[in-house]
Structure formats: structure tokens, C-alpha cells
């Protein structure tokens, strides 16, 4: 295999614009409608779902970069309950649990910064990129450098500034992958951002894929470029009202192969991978919408039953009240009749006693 020589990035080509992502495109409007319903009827379910997706992204992006390893069970616990150190046993990861949680929280905070930009609270500029890089590498103090003789050594990591030295990795078979020389990074990033502004009417997944690849071609930072690239890809998708991009650890080889294909001029494998991941995220989100519909239907049914029960109870109360009134009147009449009868008997007894004093006994 030959060395890969750097060349300036290129705008989105006509060929790349025509990449067919129909299977995912068909879900866009369905998801946008569902999102609107969720925002109006069950915003807490939508927020919880996005939160889990962001935490999954935060875990997987570091695993892709070999910053740490983490077993699946602990991964799911952290995604469900949040980044809590007590959930991580020392045997479940290859670094100290406290350090793992620090890194995960950095990566989660970086995606929150992305969401601030999506909400319009930050502009998408070089300064924003630098802030994102600082946040993503907050607990990474060093990086591995290779000198001109091929010797590897740990050096201090420069955060929030573009690289000042080449960062061209040597592959296992000995070939060199050349990224953008430091002297051209500023102008290449400016081109990338300027072209991005022209693509607002293009398929957002194609644009996100193009941006992701061109950013990795530049490799503007000393280290952390993959994490920044994936965070910025999520930014582009979320600006189009789509969902964060989560590349799972099991897809690492496919992801890297797709990036190499893009280096050779074929963006389709990477776009297809991103579309597949976005489609899976949308379908999962639609299940949240369906669950919300079921929950709403259950709530409506419960409300109808409660309303009918209330009406029945009110009618029963009215009936019972009327019955109590009737019983009271009847009791009063009985008491009045008994009194009248007793008075009549008393009068009759007195009269008879006068006429037949010794023969009449009325008790």
C-alpha cells in the first residue's frame, strides 16, 4: 500500500450530491412530525430519549479512540442512570473509574455545547471548534507523538489551538497517511465553514458526511480530531432536526474503512453508514412517540372512565339524598300518625271509662 499524500479539501461534488439515501430520507418528515407531537404532548419523554442518546455517544466516541474500554453491562447502566462513578467497578474498565467518569462527563458536556450552538446560543466558528476541543480533552494531558526517526513518545497536549507540528500517522504496514500541513490549517478550516454555509438545501446526512470527512482530512488538532469530527457531525444533523450520530464500537472497522474509501474519492460508504445509524436512531425515537401515543390513549381512557364514574357517583348521591328525604318524611308521618292514634285511643279510653267504668280495659 502506498503512502497517502495530502491534498486540499474539495467542496461537495455533484456526484456526492447524488448519493442515494432514499430509505432514510423517507423517514425525515415522519420524524419531524413525531418530534413536534412529542414536544407538544410529552417533552419529558423526548428530553429523556435525547439524553440517553447523548450519553451513548459520549461513551462510544472515546472507545472508538481507544481512550478506554468499558463492558456492555456497565455501558447500559451509565446510559440509563447517568455518569455515576459508583456504577463502575474497577474490573469493568481498563482505567480508573474516577478518570473514566471525568472523561465521559467532558464528552457529554461537549455535546451539550453542540446543542447550545444548535439552539442559536453560539455561532459555528473556529472559536467554537476550539472551545469544543478544549472541553473534549479537558482530562487528557498528553498525546503520543512520532519523531522523524519513527520513535514514539508522550508529549503535552495543546488544547484549543490548531496543530503546530505535523500529525501524520504511520500505519501498521509502514505507510504514512499525510494530513494537512500546519501552515494550511487556518485556510482549510475557513474553506470548510464557508462551503458548509452554501449547503443548507442539500441532504443533511450527505452534508454531515462530507463535513466529517473533510475535517478528518485536515486533522487540524494535535489530537482529538475524531472526537471533534463526530461532535460537529452531530451538530450538522441536529441543526436539520435530526438526531445525534452514535458510531458503536462494533462498527469501528467499518467506519475506518469508509473513511479510507472517502480519502480515495468515494464518499458513498461513509454516507450509507451514517444514514443507517440515523435511520436506527429515528426508528427508536418513533417508538418513543408510539409509546407516548399509547400512554396518551391510556390516560384518555382513564379520564373517560373517571368522568363516567364521577357522573354515576353524582347521580347516586342525588338518588341517595332523595331517598333519605323520602325516608325522613315517612318517618315523620309514622311518628305523627302514631301520635294521633295514641291521642285518639286515649280519648276513646276516657269516654268509655265514663260510660262503662268497670267493664272496659284498653291498654
Listing of model-derived features with the role each one plays in the protein:
Residues 1-223, 227-363:
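FIC/Doc superfamily catalytic core
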Amino acid at each position: 500500500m502506498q503512502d497517502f499524500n495530502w491534498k486540499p479539501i474539495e467542496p461537495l461534488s455533484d456526484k456526492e450530491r447524488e448519493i442515494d439515501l432514499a430509505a432514510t430520507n423517507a423517514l425525515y418528515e415522519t420524524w419531524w412530525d413525531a418530534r413536534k407531537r412529542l414536544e407538544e404532548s410529552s417533552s419529558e419523554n423526548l428530553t429523556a430519549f435525547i439524553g440517553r442518546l447523548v450519553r451513548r455517544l459520549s461513551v462510544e466516541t472515546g472507545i472508538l479512540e481507544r481512550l478506554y474500554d468499558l463492558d456492555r453491562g456497565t455501558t447500559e447502566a451509565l446510559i440509563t442512570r447517568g455518569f455515576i462513578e459508583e456504577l463502575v467497578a474497577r474490573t469493568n474498565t481498563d482505567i480508573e473509574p474516577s478518570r473514566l467518569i471525568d472523561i465521559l462527563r467532558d464528552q457529554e458536556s461537549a455535546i451539550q455545547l453542540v446543542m447550545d450552538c444548535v439552539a442559536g446560543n453560539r455561532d459555528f466558528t473556529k472559536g467554537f471548534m476550539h472551545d469544543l476541543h478544549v472541553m473534549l480533552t479537558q482530562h487528557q494531558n498528553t498525546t503520543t507523538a512520532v519523531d522523524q526517526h519513527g520513535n514514539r513518545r508522550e508529549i503535552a497536549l495543546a488544547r484549543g489551538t490548531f496543530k503546530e507540528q505535523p500529525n501524520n500517522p504511520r500505519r501498521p504496514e509502514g505507510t504514512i497517511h499525510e494530513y494537512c500541513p500546519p501552515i494550511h490549517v487556518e485556510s482549510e478550516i475557513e474553506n470548510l465553514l464557508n462551503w458548509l454555509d452554501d449547503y443548507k438545501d442539500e441532504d443533511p446526512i450527505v452534508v454531515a458526511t462530507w463535513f466529517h470527512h473533510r475535517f478528518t482530512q485536515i486533522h487540524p488538532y494535535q489530537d482529538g480530531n475524531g472526537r471533534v469530527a463526530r461532535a460537529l457531525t452531530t451538530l450538522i444533523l441536529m441543526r436539520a432536526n435530526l438526531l445525534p450520530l452514535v458510531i458503536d464500537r462494533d462498527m469501528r472497522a467499518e467506519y475506518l474503512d469508509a473513511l479510507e474509501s472517502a480519502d480515495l474519492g468515494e464518499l458513498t460508504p461513509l454516507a450509507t453508514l451514517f444514514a443507517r445509524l440515523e435511520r436506527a436512531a429515528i426508528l427508536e425515537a418513533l417508538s418513543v412517540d408510539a409509546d407516548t401515543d399509547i400512554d396518551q390513549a391510556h390516560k384518555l381512557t382513564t379520564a373517560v372512565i373517571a368522568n363516567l364514574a364521577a357522573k354515576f357517583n353524582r347521580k347516586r348521591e342525588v338518588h341517595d339524598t332523595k331517598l333519605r328525604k323520602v325516608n325522613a318524611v315517612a318517618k315523620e308521618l309514622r311518628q305523627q300518625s302514631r301520635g294521633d292514634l295514641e291521642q285518639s285511643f286515649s280519648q276513646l279510653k276516657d269516654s268509655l271509662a265514663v260510660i262503662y267504668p268497670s267493664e272496659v280495659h284498653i291498654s
